[in-house]
Regions:
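Histidine-anchored nucleotide/phosphate-binding helix
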Residues: 69, 267-281
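Short strand-turn-strand beta-turns centered on an Asx-Gly dipeptide
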Residues: 138-141, 413, 417-419, 450-451
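Gly-rich Lys/Arg/Thr-decorated short loops/hinges at beta-loop-alpha junctions or inter-strand turns
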Residues: 180-183, 188-195, 246-260, 364-370, ...
Length: 588
């Protein structure tokens, strides 16, 4: 931690902020760091010391947390940061030209800051706006569909903010999106908001769990764990725990994933209602939304929704007049660490620590947040549970297939004419989804990435596979977070593979060696293949060996899936990593 010897830090600016946190402990560290950095633009040693004294956290621990999260700064930094996406969807949409235009306009290279102008420039992983590629953030102002001609307006802060693009149907979980004012509780109520909560309060928790089990709703974040079973396990947690928690995992950070942002921006009250229903069912009194730091509009709308729900009696003590039904929600903002999407790393982050994953067992339903019973669900999963309660099991099961009932949100991006979030029943094929998105831009589809950066590539001969849990299992590919990223014949797959490997090397927390070393070496090999001379004879064997080692020995899901897409590409197109293979990573 270095800073100029002559720098004077005015701690009087911090006193009113520290006063709000008097009596709090380490669990308040992340929000306090965010508030302090908003004052100073960075986190000087003196500020960290004052925070440590307030929360009773050692300076070394605070420094470790600041170093862990990419959006916190230990050294002087400009207050306004331009963050430009450098991942596949933006790359395919002309992101490099936008990056160059911003560099020339600012006179900065990536990672540099103009302290006099108080502005910095960074290239960052996916910002979760892939339907608006290329995209960027100017401080807390998002912008999408950028071209070099838009850069002046973007940097001036007058370029329009993008709205989620939502398509498909029938709309079940996104039925209000685009139809209501997302800042208005009255509008939400007018279109059926909180009818679900009132309905469940006429039922016993056991009856709700029976409904969820009958619906076969599985986790929508990738793990596919049955929701009814998870809620039941937390409700029945042994030992009469004093507190239970509901956690919404809104740390949506995987390249190509942007579905949860659509709900949080367009219908934020529904997430609050769904969490409250979960709390009633499980017997929880504490709710937490862990939101990625790069979603500023979601943050504003969720805070507004929480405040208005609390003021109207939908949160707090004796909710809707029910004595003893006490539940409240706190929004926690992340700071740029994909690993915090792993549920136990998320717990560590909320508790004010570095986001290292925990060893399991024990599992969250008995030993989760603060070592207490916890239900942690993805945003779409909570929306699905609320939908089942609202429409009933029989109506829910009329959609989709027998083994995959209901609807799913798919994030369609890349080389298609109409990228966006598509809510559709389970059972459509990959080809049908691509056609729904207007079809591919080029003459033919070269490949599709299914399930996200941690998913798999499929070739043109696999486009007629239905998107269901049973078909995904039969064909050995994950639905994951619902990513469908399309690559036509113009795309260099070498570049895409390198970008995926770069993402995981950047996001590995470093706790376990297989992931820490494997992701770095995987990236190095693919960078050389793509940009510095092409494949060597040993590359295929080395990549497969490293990939399998990471898959089998890494501690958490990040390392276990960091090579999944790469291994699938090698299996389909071994010539990509062999000498005299594909020309420029494209089909011959």
């Amino acid at each position: 931690m270095t800073q100029p010897d002559t720098l004077t830090v005015d701690l009087s600016l911090l006193q009113s902020v520290l006063a709000k946190y008097a009596g709090r402990r380490r669990e308040a560290l992340l929000p306090l760091l965010h508030e302090a950095q908003a004052l100073y633009g960075w986190l000087p040693r003196e500020v960290q010391e004052a925070i440590g004294e307030t929360l009773r956290v050692p300076l070394a621990d605070i420094h470790g947390v600041v170093e862990f999260y990419s959006m916190f700064y230990n050294e002087p930094m400009a207050r306004k940061v331009v963050r430009v996406c450098m991942d596949p969807a933006c790359h395919m949409a002309g992101g490099a030209a936008v990056q160059l235009a911003i560099q020339e306009r600012l006179g900065l290279k990536p990672g540099e800051a103009d302290m006099e102008a108080d502005i910095a420039y960074e290239l960052v992983p996916c910002l979760g706006m892939c339907e608006h590629a290329p995209n960027a953030l100017l401080g807390d102002r998002p912008a999408g569909d950028l071209t070099p001609a838009d850069v002046d307006a973007f940097l001036a802060g007058v370029y329009p903010e993008p709205e989620p693009k939502i398509y498909g149907g029938p709309f079940i979980k996104l039925t209000r999106a685009g139809r209501v004012d997302p800042t208005s509780l009255a509008d939400f109520e007018k279109y059926g908001g909180y009818d679900g909560l009132r309905n469940v309060m006429t039922m016993s928790p056991e009856e709700i769990i029976v409904q969820l089990k009958g619906s076969d709703v599985l986790g929508r974040g990738g793990a596919m764990f049955p929701v009814g079973l998870k809620w039941e396990m937390a409700r029945q947690a042994p030992g009469e725990p004093s507190e239970k928690h509901i956690v919404a995992n809104a740390d949506e950070s995987e390249p190509g994933t942007f579905k949860d942002r659509a709900l949080m921006e367009q219908d934020p009250f529904s997430l609050i209602e769904a969490m409250t229903v979960a709390a009633y069912t499980v017997g929880a009194s504490n709710g937490w939304i862990f939101l990625r730091g790069e979603y500023p509009r979601c943050e504003k709308r969720l805070r507004n929704a929480i405040d208005k729900a609390r003021a109207a009696g939908y949160l707090g003590h004796n909710i809707l007049g029910r004595k003893g039904f006490n539940f409240d929600i706190e929004l926690r903002l992340g700071a740029g660490a994909y690993i915090c999407g792993e549920e136990t790393a998320l717990f560590e982050a909320i508790e004010g620590k570095r986001g290292f994953p925990r060893i399991k067992p024990p599992y969250p339903t008995t030993h989760g947040l603060f070592n207490q019973p916890t239900v942690v669900n993805n945003v779409e999963t909570l929306a699905a549970a609320l939908s089942v309660i609202g429409m009933g099991v029989n109506q829910w099961r009329k959609l989709g297939t027998v083994d995959s009932p209901g609807t799913k949100w798919f994030c369609i991006s890349g080389r298609v004419l109409r990228p966006g979030v598509y809510e559709v029943p389970f059972g459509l094929t990959i080809r049908q989804l691509v056609q729904l998105a207007g079809g591919q831009i080029g003459d033919e589809i070269q490949a599709v990435l299914v399930g996200g950066a941690a998913g798999v590539f499929v070739g043109p001969d696999q486009l007629d596979i239905p998107l269901t849990y049973e078909d995904a299992k039969a064909h050995n590919f994950p639905l994951g977070s619902g990513v469908i990223m399309v690559f036509d014949e113009a795309v260099d797959l070498h570049e895409i593979m390198y970008m995926l490997s770069r993402f995981f090397a950047h996001e590995s927390c470093g706790k376990c060696y297989p992931c820490q070393l494997g992701t770095q070496r995987q990236m190095e090999i693919l960078e050389r293949i793509t940009y510095h001379g092409g494949p060597q004879p040993s590359d295929r064997a080395d990549l497969v060996d490293m990939g399998l080692t990471m898959t089998e020995t890494s501690l958490c899901g990040l390392g276990q899936t960091a090579a999944t897409a790469i291994l699938s590409a090698i299996a389909l197109w071994p010539e990509l990593v062999q000498p005299a293979g594909r020309v420029n990573g494209r089909l011959r």
